[in-house]
Design a protein with these regions (language model features):
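Amphipathic alpha-helical packing segments from all-alpha helical-bundle domains
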Residues: 33, 71, 76-83, 90-117
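Hydrophobic/aromatic-rich alpha-helical bundle segments in the mid-to-C-terminal region
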Residues: 94, 98, 102, 112-163
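C-terminal effector-binding regulatory domain of bacterial HTH transcription factors
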Residues: 167-174
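A short secondary-structure junction motif
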Residues: 28-32, 36, 40, 89, ...
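Residues in soluble alpha-helical coiled-coils and helical-bundle/repeat scaffolds
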Residues: 12-16, 20, 70, 87, ...
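Amphipathic alpha-helical segments that line or abut small-molecule/effector binding pockets
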Residues: 51-71, 76-84, 127, 131, ...
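Alpha-helical structural segments
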Residues: 16-64, 95, 99-110, 156, ...
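Helix-turn-helix
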Residues: 1-24
C-alpha cells in the first residue's frame, strides 16, 4: 500500500489530496446513480425515467441510492467527514450544504417542475415538493450514521415516505 508520506509524491499538498477525494467521491456516486438512470446534474434528462414510473419501482430506486449512500465506504466516509467538519470550516459547511442539500433539492425541484408540466404530478409548488421529498431522506441517513442499529427501521420509514409522497402527489392517469 501507499504510505502517508508518499502521498505527497503524487499530490502537491493536503488540499490537492482533499480535492482528489472530493472528485473521486462525486464520480463514484454519479456512476452508481447513472446505473439507476438518475443523473442529479440533469433533471430534464431524467424526466422520461420518472414519467409513468410506478410506486414500487420508485421506492426501490430510492432504497438502492439510500443503501449505496450508507454503505459505499468512500461515499459514507466522506459524508461523515463533511458532517463533522462543517462546524469547523465555513468552506466545508458550504460544500456540505451544496452537495447534500441544495444540489438534491434543486434536482428534484427541476424534475418535479417537468413532471407537473407533463401531468405526472399534481400542480403544486415544485420547490416545496422537493423540500418535502428530500428532507426526510437526509434525516434518515443522518439517523443511520449516528445509530446504525436503526437501519432496518429507517429503511421501512424511507419506503413509507416515498410511497406516501407518490400516492399524495402523483396524478392518476386513466
Amino acid at each position: 500500500g501507499i504510505r502517508a508520506p508518499s502521498l505527497y509524491n503524487h499530490f502537491a499538498g493536503k488540499q490537492a489530496i482533499f480535492d482528489a477525494i472530493v472528485e473521486d467521491t462525486a464520480k463514484r456516486y454519479d456512476e452508481f446513480t447513472a446505473r439507476l438512470s438518475v443523473h442529479v446534474g440533469n433533471a430534464e434528462g431524467d424526466v422520461p425515467v420518472f414519467d409513468g414510473i410506478g410506486e414500487d419501482v420508485l421506492a426501490d430506486k430510492v432504497k438502492q441510492i439510500f443503501l449505496y449512500s450508507l454503505h459505499d465506504p468512500s461515499v459514507s466516509a466522506f459524508r461523515r467527514l463533511l458532517t463533522i467538519e462543517q462546524f469547523r470550516s465555513p468552506a466545508l459547511a458550504a460544500m456540505y450544504t451544496e452537495r447534500y442539500v441544495s444540489r438534491l433539492v434543486t434536482y428534484h425541484q427541476r424534475l418535479f417542475e417537468r413532471l407537473i408540466a407533463t401531468g405526472e404530478l399534481v400542480e403544486e409548488d415544485a420547490g416545496v415538493l422537493a423540500l418535502m421529498y428530500v428532507t426526510p431522506v437526509l434525516t434518515l441517513i443522518g439517523v443511520c450514521d449516528r445509530q446504525p442499529e436503526r437501519e432496518a427501521e429507517c429503511i421501512e420509514k424511507l419506503s413509507a415516505h416515498v410511497r406516501l409522497f407518490y400516492r399524495s402527489y402523483h396524478k392518476k392517469k386513466n
